[in-house]
Amino acid sequence: DIYVYCAEIPTAETRENLLEKYCSIAEFGNHYWESEDNTVMNNGVPVDIIYREVDRFGRYIDTVIKGGKAFNGYTTAFWHNIKNSKVLFDKTGTFTKFRDMAQIDFPENLRSAIIKNNRNLLNGKLPSYDRQIKKAQERGDIVSVNHRITAFLESYFDVIFALNRQTHPG
């Protein structure tokens, strides 16, 4: 994967005009998860190019890393991505500044929030995943069982990484 952090995401048409000569197969402007171009380069190497607005990560740092906001799984995945990015080009230094801000120890308030939020989702509460899985199983809804097990694992791994003060690799 190649992540392109920019002030404004270029249009799919602009990206296609720039990249098409380097690709044997390409889909420009996919938005299944993020704004991305999915390609196979002329040398046969598959490359996914994901475009992100850099200001979004300033808000993420403020909300999650500094503010201690937990999500239902994958809480620190963007932090992990920022922290471990290899900067190839940064004309303004904006992304490098965010990456440098991400080089901190795991904040205790975030660790506690992740554990509390996701632990409550695992079991012991009325809407906990264990109860959702059991209800889906009782009604014979195997698709829902699978869906809730996946959500359970997302929260479970969020807790494991937080307990160990490690960012989630996504």
Regions of interest found by a model, annotated:
Residues 1-21, 38-51:
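Catalytic metal-binding acidic patch
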Residues 26-137:
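Conserved NTP/Mg2+-binding pocket subregion across the NTase superfamily
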Residues 144-145:
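Solenoid-repeat scaffolds in large eukaryotic assemblies
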Residues 155-164:
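Extended, well-ordered alpha-helical segments in internal regulatory regions
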Residues 165-170:
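Short, charged amphipathic alpha-helical segments flanked by flexible coils
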